[in-house]
Design a protein with these regions (language model features):
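ABC-family P-loop ATPase nucleotide-binding domain
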Residues: 1-25
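ABC ATP-binding cassette signature C-motif
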Residues: 16-212
């Protein structure tokens, strides 16, 4: 895999789609699973271009918060309020944004319907899916390959708010550096959940949200 690692292209996220001053807000979010209350009364405003890192112990509900913000789950109370022009890019730690019934290239086409085949394959090449790799069914991908595909889908989405749940897990060192470099130059808003101190450094957050 050494040769493959050498080929990681210099990634950059495209310019985010235009949006209002506060593309995403949450008010009074609460969530419980059965009798287990995950969190209650969470308020959050994500301004255009802001960088927020979500902190908290394991089980504090960091992943759950991103799922609520991304519309994957509904809160028990409170609301998520989309602002003008909101376009979310959600990176799920469990890769559930990937459709395992589709091939790698079909997943990327779905994420960027406006791109032609040459552009799609070029993006996949920069994420180390070249030639026949791009035509593999997503269900046979390794954890690291799924991470690379999910990140490729984010890159083409022109999202203006990225919700990232442990985006550097399963990545080889060279790919991790590229992703962190791309995040550092991204001009949209980012909400990051991570145990990777290097990722927090690269993001250079404006603030942290501490879940109890």
């Amino acid at each position: 895999d050494e040769a493959a690692v050498e080929k990681v292209a210099h990634l950059r996220f495209p310019d985010p789609a235009p949006c209002g001053k506060t593309p995403l807000r949450a008010a009074g979010l609460s969530k419980a699973y059965g009798s287990l209350e995950v969190f209650a009364g969470v308020d959050l405003a994500i301004d255009r271009g802001s960088r927020v890192v979500v902190l908290g112990l394991n089980g504090a509900g960091k992943t759950t918060l991103l799922r609520l913000l991304g519309g994957v789950e509904e809160p028990d109370s409170g609301e998520v309020i989309p602002g003008h022009g909101l376009k979310i890019g959600y990176y799920a730690q469990e890769h559930e944004t990937i459709d395992t019934d589709l091939t790698v290239v079909e997943n990327l086409r779905r994420a960027a319907p406006g791109m032609d085949d040459t552009q799609v394959r070029s993006v996949l090449g920069s994420f180390l899916f070249s030639g026949s790799d791009a035509d593999k069914p997503a269900r046979v991908l390794s954890g690291g390959e799924k991470t690379r595909l999910a990140l490729a889908m984010l890159v083409v989405s022109s999202a203006n708010v990225l919700l990232l749940d442990e985006p550097t897990n399963n990545l080889d060192p060279a790919s991790r550096e590229e992703i962190l470099g791309a995040l550092g130059t991204f001009t949209g808003a980012v909400v990051l959940v991570t145990h990777d101190e290097g990722a927090v450094e690269a993001l250079n957050p404006d603030r942290g949200l501490l879940l109890p």
